[in-house]
């Protein structure tokens, strides 16, 4: 069993397993998000003005990094993973993530698409018409995960990385001797 003789040795010892645990949690969040996007966004209604691409399922990325004193992970909207459509009304990709009228004609809507869908921002016909109502998958994702799943996934991730852990509901007080 490895032994740490200083705080820095302990940090060095735990850095890799904790980073692996964070990656595990990020993968779980990514998978849960696919389910939430399906339920909240795609099953909410069927559009009449455009064909769906399903790109919002995959428009997310994860990133993890560690420093000498911290490890962290990030789950975020990544519009670069989405396709951009056409302004041609005859195209099957008409109005897919692109402005089709007025001042927004030909402008890429992907950077704002999550805000448009989740927040029901009213753009009129500029980025596809008639978003019927807010379909806030982000809030639902946070509700579904909550503190319990986050804690459970972190424990599972740390155990998968080779650490034996015991989770607590209150912070532990450590006294150095």
Residue ranges of model-derived segments:
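Charged, low-complexity interaction tracts
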Residues: 2-4, 8, 46-177
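N-terminal, Lys/Arg- and Ser/Thr-rich interaction peptides
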Residues: 1-20
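Conserved aromatic-histidine-acidic binding/catalytic patches
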Residues: 17, 21, 25, 29, ...
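Non-globular disordered terminal and juxtamembrane segments underlying protein topogenesis/assembly
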Residues: 21-44, 150
């Amino acid at each position: 069993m490895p032994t740490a003789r200083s705080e820095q040795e302990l940090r060095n010892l735990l850095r890799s397993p904790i980073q692996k645990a964070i990656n595990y949690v990020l993968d779980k969040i990514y998978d849960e998000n696919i389910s939430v996007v399906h339920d909240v966004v795609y099953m909410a209604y069927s559009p009449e003005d455009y064909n769906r691409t399903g790109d919002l399922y995959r428009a997310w990325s994860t990133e993890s990094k560690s420093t000498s004193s911290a490890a962290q992970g990030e789950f975020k909207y990544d519009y670069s993973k989405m396709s951009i459509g056409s302004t041609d009304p005859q195209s099957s990709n008409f109005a897919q993530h692109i402005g089709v009228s007025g001042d927004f004609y030909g402008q890429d809507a992907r950077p704002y698409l999550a805000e448009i869908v989740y927040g029901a921002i009213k753009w009129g016909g500029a980025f596809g018409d008639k978003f019927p109502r807010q379909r806030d998958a982000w809030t639902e994702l946070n509700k579904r995960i909550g503190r319990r799943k986050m804690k459970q996934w972190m424990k599972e991730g740390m155990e998968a990385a080779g650490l034996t852990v015991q989770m607590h509901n209150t912070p532990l007080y450590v006294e150095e001797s």
